Amino acid sequence: MNDKSNLPPVTEAIDENHIIAERREKLAKLRKGGVAFPNDFAPTHLAADLHSYYDSLTKKELAAKKIHVKVAGRMVLKRVMGKTSFATIQDRSGQIQFYINDELSGADVHGAFKHWDMGDFISTEGNLFKTNKGELSVECSNLRLLSKSLRPLPDKFHGLSDLETKYRQRYVDLIVNPESRSTFKARSNAIASLRRHMLDADFMEVETPMLHPIPGGAAAKPFITHHNALDMQMFLRIAPELYLKRLVVGGFERVFEINHNFRNEGVSPRHNPEFTMMEFYAAYTDYRWLMDFTEGLIRAAAIDAQGTAVLTHQGRELDLSKPFQRLTITEAILKYCGQSGKSYEAAQLEDANFIRVELKKGGENPDAPTLKNAGIGALQLALFELVAEEHLWEPTYIIDYPIEVSPLARESDTRPGITERFELFITGREIANGFSELNDAEDQANRFRKQVEQKEAGDEEAMYFDHDFIRALEYGMPPTGGCGIGIDRLIMLLTDAPNIRDVILFPHLRREED
């Protein structure tokens, strides 16, 4: 039989609009025949479970058991051979084949099946058996069309290779690309692991506002909106930090939140304006405790998502099982600058003029608002970002950040101008940021004032003065450590994804042309 559905669904030789028109005609006939989209079928098994339970049985052993099953899914493969046919359906767990002929289900049902298309949702019922080639299959005694597909799927030879289409039509990507389904299953497992470990450590999960009257908790440019009922300007949150610390003030000594943040900034393989973060705060801890705890979280997430802490990322081994190294900013510059073709002496890194010259050589503008009046600590950080950051492949904590770039972090008791802060880098990407929290209300107010001065001088990412947060601190906050982990970047590591859009189900794209 010449079955059109056996041809590749989308090729240069076949016009997609013509295929859609043909399928609409088929749907119209189904509507005339009764219920075109029935909703009264309940599967008894998933494809993967059937393979797990019965793949090991011989053909004879399986036949003796007479195992009756009901399965349903999207038809992704179809072979019609006269009076017999084979097809494969795909459910959320995997794929399974079924066999149909005129005798088993009746010539009318088999005849109707021959006109069904790839992408249609089908239910099948019958006994399990194994083909002569040993493939587990369902011997179909009852077959129904549950949902008609109007658009053809990409053919298996060409797949869905256009990245923009892949991101924009994620539903098609998930249908045809098992790698994408695997990525998002791993993402779900990793987040579940993080949540489980937080709860096991006696943290309480909370939800804080997405709309803020004042943007705060990070240095970033916010999205702005308007609250009609209150007639006031609002900001999509750039970070939940200040609200979570209010909860610590209120007596919830261990809190965490996994949710979205929004930053009205650039899009790149590492940045998406809407992204997922986990932030957590623990009273009576400091940044060293946080580093130990965060290291354990990430290692456990890797094992729970991928079964191992030793991964391969972009062709290179990434070992999360070893202790994460810890370096100061200047130690990291001296250790890694050679990979950027640079060589420095420790004394040079204490010379502000020298660093400004090096920044200019690297294409940075030392007179930009963020650097024009910068102290030595901020300049060292800028040089680190220029010559060392991208080379931090193995997990590395960069510690002891300057106070001028850490307005919410506690200052060191022994090193004036340095805060008890860290950032975690893996494969050259920032994955986490944490510190011993500043709980001195007067010190925090002074730092907010300096941030306002920087904003007035042209730094768009400087923080606002949050009077209510200061009021909260004035009631007293216990010594506290807090950390934020970038979930999307973490998933990139765990799934070997080169682009952040590969791990976000529906990333932002330019408006689609009509």
UniProtKB/Swiss-Prot annotation:
Which EC number(s) does UniProt give?
Answer: 6.1.1.6
Q: Where in the cell is it found?
A: Cytoplasm
Q: What class of enzyme is it?
A: ligase
Its predominant location is: cytoplasm
- BP terms from Gene Ontology: lysyl-tRNA aminoacylation
Q: Which GO terms describe its cellular component?
A: cytosol
Which reaction(s) are listed as its catalytic activity?
Answer: tRNA(Lys) + L-lysine + ATP = L-lysyl-tRNA(Lys) + AMP + diphosphate
Fetch the CDD domains from UniProt: LysRS_core, LysRS_N
Q: Which InterPro entries match?
A: Aa-tRNA-synt_II (IPR004364), aa-tRNA-synth_II (IPR006195), aa-tRNA-synth_II/BPL/LPL (IPR045864), Lys-tRNA-ligase_II (IPR002313), Lys-tRNA-ligase_II_N (IPR044136), Lys-tRNA-synth_II_C (IPR018149), NA-bd_OB-fold (IPR012340), NA-bd_OB_tRNA (IPR004365)
Which sites bind Mg(2+) 1? Answer: E423, E430
Required co-factor(s) are:
Mg(2+)
Cofactor remark: Binds 3 Mg(2+) ions per subunit.
Q: List the disulfide bonds.
A: none
Among Pfam families, the record links this protein to: tRNA-synt_2, tRNA_anti-codon
Assigned keywords, A-Z? Aminoacyl-tRNA synthetase, ATP-binding, Cytoplasm, Ligase, Magnesium, Metal-binding, Nucleotide-binding, Protein biosynthesis
Q: Which residues bind Mg(2+) 2?
A: E430
User: Could you cite one Gene Ontology molecular function of this protein?
Assistant: tRNA binding
Coiled-coil intervals = none
Q: Which HAMAP family match?
A: Lys_tRNA_synth_class2
Q: How does it assemble?
A: Homodimer.
Family matches, as NCBIfam families: lysS_bact (TIGR00499), PRK00484.1 (NF001756)
**Homology family:** Belongs to the class-II aminoacyl-tRNA synthetase family.
Protein name, UniProt field:
Lysine--tRNA ligase
Protein source organism: Polynucleobacter necessarius subsp. necessarius (strain STIR1)
